[in-house]
Amino acid sequence: IRDFCLSRGLGDVYKRQNVESLLHKQRFITTATIDPAVRSARLPEDRFLESLSALVTQEVGKTLGLLNNYAASTAYSTANLRSAKFTSEHGLAPSIMDGEFYNYVAQPSDKGVRLINNVLGEYDRYAIEWGYRYFPEEEGDPAREAKRLVEFVNKKVANPIYRYAPRQTYSVDPTVRTEDLGDDHLMSSTLGMKNLAIIRSQLGQWIQNDPDS
């Protein structure tokens, strides 16, 4: 199970090789300062399965029709992403479809904070309900069902956790980026760079006997 990566077809998730190396590199550079378990040349089994579950959940989301939602990661404040209580209740973003699985803003002093986003968020459940909810009282009338769906969306439109935005091609919205976290991008980036500086200074001690190092 450690030696495959994922691609998606219509209703299928395909297995290929080498996913462990990818997950290890991503998790190491984002969480090694706060999680001693990943300071090795290979992920421990429990950390690997956590990371794999995040990747599989996202791919299964795509088979259900969920699109990548790059607005989700700015719904929560950068400060809240350092809170053990907040992250245990809400995860790192309201959608697993945003693309950033790991809490790179968490600092070594942030004890108990959630480090991985591997469960469905509030936006995901909302999008699945929109796509699959059945209205038996509307007797299959598409116009009446469409009206109900519009009402469903309008109830959530003012709440930022239900915001959706696709990958940008030509426009530039700083709140819609891939692999970002938090509502304050400058602060999140500063915290992430602090972690990278620590990792760089400790790399020789944390990773030993690695043929690629």
Roles of regions detected by a PLM:
Residues 1-14:
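Single conserved hydrophobic/aromatic residue that forms the stacking wall/gate
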Residues 26-35:
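Preference for solvent-exposed, low-hydrophobicity sequence contexts
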Residues 34-37, 104:
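Active-site-flanking segments in enzyme catalytic domains
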Residues 38-56:
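Short pre-active-site segment immediately N-terminal to the catalytic Zn-binding motif
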Residues 44-47, 73-213:
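Conserved catalytic/binding loops enriched for acidic/polar residues
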Residues 52-58, 96-100:
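A short, hydrophobic secondary-structure junction motif
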Residues 54-69:
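Active-site recognition of the HExxH zinc-binding catalytic motif
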